[in-house]
């Protein structure tokens, strides 16, 4: 007959082995949950709505309601008529200190002839009526030494002349060379400009 102590000693290794098995199973099974590894977190991609693009910058433009680009200039705006400036409309992008307007004739008999120069035009959009100078602008003497507009007046028999109405975008306030007029002033404006837009009208000589 075994003594109580002997029976206890025989059972102790079995109990210890059983406890170790429970601990091992608990460590492997994670409490009975899914033993697969959790995949790494991947943030969702952020997309930009392609249907709402940023607003486009306003372009530099010049036009006239009295004649289209490349079309004849009405006689009322020439020396054969009232000799007043045609109405104009224009727009410019942001960033200009001022705008400038130069009207010239590259087909003049004696070479390039500047008919009108206006500097200091307020940036942005604007318009003029017949005979008006753009807002904020002041005239620089043209090739004939005259301040203000002088319309098409080509000699007879000289063919088609092209009158260029060029609007310049000036990023800083214009400083013309002292005494600059006509072609010299027009060249200084073109060199200082960061952009230009042009309207061309024709007139027969």
From Swiss-Prot:
Record-stated family:
Belongs to the UPF0098 family.
Report the protein name in the record.
Putative lipoprotein LppC
Subcellular localization? Cell membrane
Q: Which organism is it from?
A: Mycobacterium tuberculosis (strain CDC 1551 / Oshkosh)
Q: What membrane topology is given?
A: Lipid-anchor
Q: Which UniProt keywords apply?
A: Cell membrane, Lipoprotein, Membrane, Palmitate, Signal
Q: Which GO terms describe its cellular component?
A: plasma membrane
The yes or no answer to whether the keyword Cell membrane is present is yes
């Amino acid at each position: 007959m075994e003594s109580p102590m002997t029976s206890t000693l025989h059972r102790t290794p079995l109990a210890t082995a059983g406890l170790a098995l429970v601990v091992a199973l608990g460590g492997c099974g994670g409490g009975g949950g899914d033993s697969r590894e959790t995949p790494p977190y991947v943030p969702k991609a952020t997309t930009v709505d392609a249907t709402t693009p940023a607003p486009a910058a306003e372009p530099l433009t010049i036009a006239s309601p009295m004649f289209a680009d490349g079309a004849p200039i009405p006689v009322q705006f020439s020396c054969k008529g009232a000799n007043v400036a045609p109405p104009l409309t224009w727009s410019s992008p942001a960033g200009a200190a001022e705008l400038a307007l130069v009207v010239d004739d590259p087909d003049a008999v004696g070479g390039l002839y500047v008919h009108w120069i206006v500097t200091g035009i307020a940036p942005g959009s604007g318009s003029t009526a017949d005979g008006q100078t753009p807002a904020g602008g002041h005239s620089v003497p043209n090739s004939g030494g005259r301040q203000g507009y002088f319309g098409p007046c080509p000699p007879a028999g000289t063919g088609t002349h092209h009158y260029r109405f060029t609007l310049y975008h000036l990023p800083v306030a214009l400083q013309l060379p002292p005494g600059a007029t006509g072609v010299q002033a027009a060249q200084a404006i073109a060199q200082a400009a960061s952009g230009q837009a042009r309207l061309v009208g024709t007139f027969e000589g």
